[in-house]
Amino acid sequence: MRKLVIQVPCYNEEATLGGTLSALPREVPGIDVVEWLIIDDGSTDKTVEVAKAHGVDHVVHLPRN
């Protein structure tokens, strides 16, 4: 099985993350699974909530930037 994980580092991206995620593919020819990984660098806004609302597969939360 071929899997692609798209990683997006974020810091206080509540206002822009939705548009970014909407532009990411969920299907890629020749790839069986596409997953999204958000790396939250200690955001103090609702970055993680926005990510989850857009169906992100994985969130890694770093406590500080």
Annotate the PLM regions.
Residues 3-5, 35:
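Cell-envelope/extracellular polymer assembly enzymes that use nucleotide-activated donors
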